[in-house]
Amino acid sequence: MTDADQAREQIREYAVEAALDKLDLDTKARLLSGQDMWSLPAIPEIGLKSLVMSDGPIGVRGVRWTADDPSIALPSPTGLAAAWDPELARRAGRLLAQEARRKGVHVLLAPTVNLHRSPLGGRHFECYSEDPYLTGAVGSGYVNGVQDGGVGTTVKHFVGNDAETERFTVDSVIAPRPLREVYLAPFEAIVANAHPWGIMTAYNRVNGTTMTEHQYLVNEVLRAEWGFDGYNVSDWMAARSTTGDILGGLDVAMPGPQTVYGPALAEAVRAGEVPESAVDTAVRNVLRLAARVGALEGAPAVVEEAPAPIDGQALARELAARGFVLVRNEAVADGSAALPLDAAAGGTVALLGAAARDARVLGGGSAVVFPERIVSPLDGLTSALRDRSGASLTYTIGADPSEELTPADKGFELRAVCRDASGAVVGEGTLPSGQVQWIGDDLPAGASYETMASIEVTGTFLPRENGEHAFGTRGLGAFTLAVGGETVWEGVQEMGNEADPFEAFFGAPSERARVTLTEGEPVEVSLTFQVPDVTALPLKAIMFSLLHLGPQREADELIAEAVEAARAADTAIVVVATTERVESEGFDRKDLALPGRQDDLVRAVAAVNPHTVVVVNAGSPVELPWRDEVAAVLLTWFPGQEGGAALADVLLGDTEPGGRLPTTWPARFADAPVTEVVPTEGRLEYGEGLFIGYRAYEARSIRPAFPFGHGLGYTDWAYESLEATAETVRVRLTNTGARPGREVVQVYLAPVDDGVERPASWLAAFAGVEAGPGESVETEIALPARAFEIWDEEARGWQRIGGTYEVRASHSHGDTRLTATLDLA
Ligand code: BGC
């Protein structure tokens, strides 16, 4: 911080104290409680604006959950981490700050820095890595970037929220060393390196205590030990105890308007259960946030002028390609590598796979944003081949993994009509899809929770195909479904066993009727929902969906068609993907298999076309049992809105695939270090201790499909020299290929016979280098002191472990290029 920055920080602190002095107990308690789904109340008397928060992390959804309010959609966090480039993450953060400012958002509810403990974790795609150091480095870049734009961040979910099953109550049982060395480590690094203005405490418990009430981890570790001075907000609906939460260091209970704070908190102070000073501490943290983001009069915002504009589409495209990981690239008939494709050669490309046309650009749950446009692989390749090469493109579905109904979308034109008990219309609005997601006051003009008795989703559907179309519902309550003017289903959906309050959001779709329709002949559709009485609920919301699934063709027939297309083509590109029902917040995965018949499709195509390139569109690891049978495999994660354009850039060789794996890809699910995420009697034991990710594969001598850090670019690198001290590592390398490229030099430490219980090796540092063909570069990489430390449980402190270490300069965890020996005193 410069002197000028420090002086401004001081002025902000004065403004905060002055504002705090003017507030009475009731107003203070009110400020700590959400006024609605996304904001805190304004307090005009002290010049405080309403602070607005929004998800995060790949875009800024804003306060409305609808495609009517679009946001840029960047690649999934796994893709961002795969770039191994904190500076790039910082640029992503700056773009998101720009989006937040545009939408009047002061605080982004991101980044998610829980770890890839098990590949089953439903929010795996939303977290960065299995490695705490890489997670901390990328997370620091991201936080710095968002805050460079004057917008706050909320590092989440503090801590131990590494899976979704029973997430509201699960007790993550984590021993002190893994807690410190693995799960807390990214949070600690981000607090130290990026000074985040906020943190979100998780739903779960850690070692018996609910995280929103965790005095030790919040007050002692996060605040006293690490010096965190931002605000602490509960995950949505996580705050459950007035006294427990305020004494546990929770500043803000979200969402509102009814929370355990507000009047209940003022009451607890009056009853002598809570000292008023605890309320003051929380208010101070909130006012400090307001001062930083420019929402408190008299306090200079950290960033007063909006930074220079950033081209969102261009950055989204660059980020996507930088995160794509080329895990396999074999030579094909002419002796050259399968990728990049020879754009000048002409010929035919057969593009296959449902996700090539209907791209999966983001993962499900609160990470969902609505981009203004989506470039699918089909869109991206069609225009690139047209503009940049003589090749022709054919497209065939091949296999469709979405066997489940999804919100009515393509071909539907829908609106919502709200009626009162007498049937009179009280409100109306257009709907971008069949999904109704109205939260708080975000209702169609005229409608209110008090007057609405029913909501009809109604309009027309123009079928894209002949045959049996399935219609269905998601949500809880009474429905009537009509197609073509006829009632095809009427019934009530009760709450299932899994009482997740977001059931209507994440719950399984239900098929209700099948109707035979003709391509191009429009038909009327209507789904009427009886509105339950939500007026007494702490959070008023209406969520339900009209679902649809087009005619399903015989899987064998689809594969046979794809095989014909592949046989006739010079190159086959198969896009395989997970679905919304596989990767989402709200539930965990059951296995790592690609859904539907996609594995069969790849095998059948590879059998007839030796130049088969498989593009994997998944946010987390999936099994690739055919990986040795195809010429190339490119992992694209959830690539964000510009994914298809970036894919064309990479396939045609305009851009190098820049990614390295941020997480190990197992050959088969059974090899994953942690294969169970279902708690036993409410407890989830982190029994593997320090051994997650590559640390576990190494300890158990299991060879993964692709190791941590692996990724091929379009050039080769010769590592020439390595010098190591306890502080720095100096590596010299040469680009020996024919193209410019970027290499991620990964530094691992491996202790030699030290008798201390710890992994055989770990990532200590890394750096990206760039060089043209034939050029050499030298990089000096700082080794953080923490890389040599372990947490001493008895002394409750960090202990430096001296002795002999092998220092490795590596292309990946499985590909060490040079080693040096270091004796640490
Ligand atoms: C998620 C948070 C998110 C919040 C608000 C919760 O269900 O766990 O990550 O920020 O909802 O959407």
Residues of each region from the PLM?
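Glycoside hydrolase catalytic-domain context in secreted enzymes
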Residues: M1-E793, G797-H813, T821-L824
